[in-house]
Amino acid sequence: MICSNRAVWRTAGLAVGTATALLTAGPPARLAGQSTTPTIDTIIVVNRNVFDLQEADAPGFIARLANRLHARTRAGVIRGTLLVNPGDRYDSARVAESERALRNLNVFSRVRIDTTRLDGRLALRVATTDGWSTKPQIGYSSAGGDVTWLVGLVEDNLLGTATSFTAVYNKTPDRRTFDLGHVNPHFLSRHGWLQARYSNKSDGDRGTWLVGVPFYETAARRAFTTDGEAASERVLVFRDGDTSAIVERRALRVGIAAGFAPHATSAGYLRLWLAGQWRREDFAPEGTTVFPRSVFGTVGAGMDVGHVRFQVLERFNSYARREDVDVSQVLHVGVWAAPRAWGYPSGQAGVGPEVSGQLAAPWRRGFAVLWAAANGVLTGGVPDSGRVAGALTIASQNLRHQTLIVHAEGAALRRPKPGAEFDLWNSQNGPRVFGIHQFTGTRRVWLALEDRLLVADDLWGLMGVGVAPFLDYGGAWYADEPARLGGAVGMSLRIGPTRAVRGDVAEFAVGYRFGKGFSGSRWGLAIRKGVRY
C-alpha cells in the first residue's frame, strides 16, 4: 500500500489521532555525463510471471503450474502506481519512491527500475516479478501450550488488479472469528484508496472502513480520507488470566481528515491537517438489558514535519527480496478538543494534546531508529487519561549472512477504555514462548536480542531458511500490582516464502523460560509468525 495510517488512540472517550503517509527517497541527482536534467521520453514495463522457467533452480512442474494458474499484474496497474510520467524531468528521488510504491502494493516479489537509452532518448525500464498471490490459509500456532488455528483464502492480486480479498476463519482460545476483507489501492482514481473489513465473531460483530485519497507520495500536496466503525461485541479484559471483567461494547463512529502541505518535495514535507469525528460508544456489563446511549463529537488539528529517507536491505524481515526500512526524521504534533457541548460529561470534557517523533541514524548495512509518542486528555488542566510509548531498534548486517538486532520498547497507559489494555500474546511484542494472556496490563516493557543467521536464501527456488538464537525479557502488569516480568533464551527456526507476494516468515521457537508468567516446565515452544522489527 502507498500510505500508512497512524493508530488512533482513544483515551477516556476522546479520540486522538491522524492519518499520515511517509514515502521518500534520496535527493534528486543528475545522470552521469549530463549537464542538464534530461526528460523521460518513454517508460518500458517488463512484468514477469511468478517463476522464470529458464532459471536452473525453477521447481519444474510446480513452476509451470503456478505460472499457468496465476493472473499476471496488468501493465496499467504498474504504470498507474509510478510517480513519474513520460515528459517529466528525470528525478532520481521520485524514481526511487516509485520503486518503493510498487513494492508497497504487495503483489511483487522483485521490483527494479533502471534507466536506458533508445535512439539517444531516455527511457525508464520498470522490471517486476509477480509473487504468488492466491494463498489458501491453513495456519497453526502455539505458545506455551495455547493453540490457535485458522483456515481460509487470501487473494492479494485479484485478476491482476492489485486489489485484495480475504476470507478467513480463525479459532483462538478466546473466540471464533470469520473475517472478510477487501483493499483497493486505486479506488475510482489513480491514487484513491478503499479498505473494508467485517468480522463475524462468536460473541459479536465488527466492521471498519476507510476511503479517500491519502498523501500518496512525499511531494503530495493534499489528502482527504474518511473512515468509520460499527460494532456490537464483547470486550475481553484480562487480569492475571481472569476474564471476570468482560463487558459489552456497542459503537458507531464516522471520521474525516483533510491535509494540506504548504511545503512538499521529494526529500521532505510540512503538512497541516484538520480532522473531526462523530461517535457513539458505550460499555456495559454482560447481560445488560437496557444499554446506555451516548453521543460524542471531537475536532482536532495539527502539523507533521518530515525529512524522509529509506534504506534498502535484504534478509531483514524476509528472504530473497528488497525491503524498505524507514529511517526518516519526523515530528507529529496535534491537539484535539472535546467540549461539553458535544456530549462529554464535565469530568471528561477537555483537550487532548498529542506528539510523536522519530530519529534515525543509518549506516552501510545497518541502522538505529528511536521512536517516541505521547497523548492524553486534560480536564480542568489535570491529566485524566493518556498513553506514552517509546522504542529503540538497532540492526546490523555488517557480518556476512547475519542480521544482529537489539530492540527495546516500553509503554504505559492511564485510565484506558476496556479492551485497550496491553496483551503481549496478541500484539507479539513480548517474550515469545509464553502462553496466552500471560502478560496483560497497563504497563509493558520488552527487550529482545536476536542474531538471524542465513542458511539458504532461496532453497529449491521456493523458500528461505534461517536460524536465530534469541534472548527475550519483558512483560506487562497493572499499575496497582508489582511488575510481572519474564524471559526466555532459546533458538528459532525461520522459514519464509521467496515467490509469494508477502515474505512473512514462520518461526518455530524453543526456549528456556525464567522469571514470572508461566507454570509447569521451564521449556516453552512457540509456532507463530516471525517478529517484524
Question: Model regions: which residues?
Answer:
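Transmembrane beta-strand segments that form the barrel wall of outer-membrane beta-barrel proteins
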Residues: 82, 113-115, 132-142, 149-172, ...
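Periplasmic polypeptide-binding modules associated with outer-membrane biogenesis and secretion
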Residues: 3, 31-155, 166-170, 175-184, ...
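Outer-envelope beta-barrel architecture signal
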Residues: 39, 122, 132-134, 147, ...
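C-terminal transmembrane beta-barrel domains of outer membrane proteins
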Residues: 82, 330-533
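Transmembrane beta-barrel wall of Gram-negative outer-membrane proteins
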Residues: 183-287
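Feature captures outer-membrane beta-barrel proteins of Gram-negative bacteria and organelles
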Residues: 149-158, 176-189, 207-219, 226, ...
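Outer-membrane beta-barrel translocator domains and adjoining extracellular loop/strand segments
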Residues: 151, 177-183, 206-212, 224-227, ...
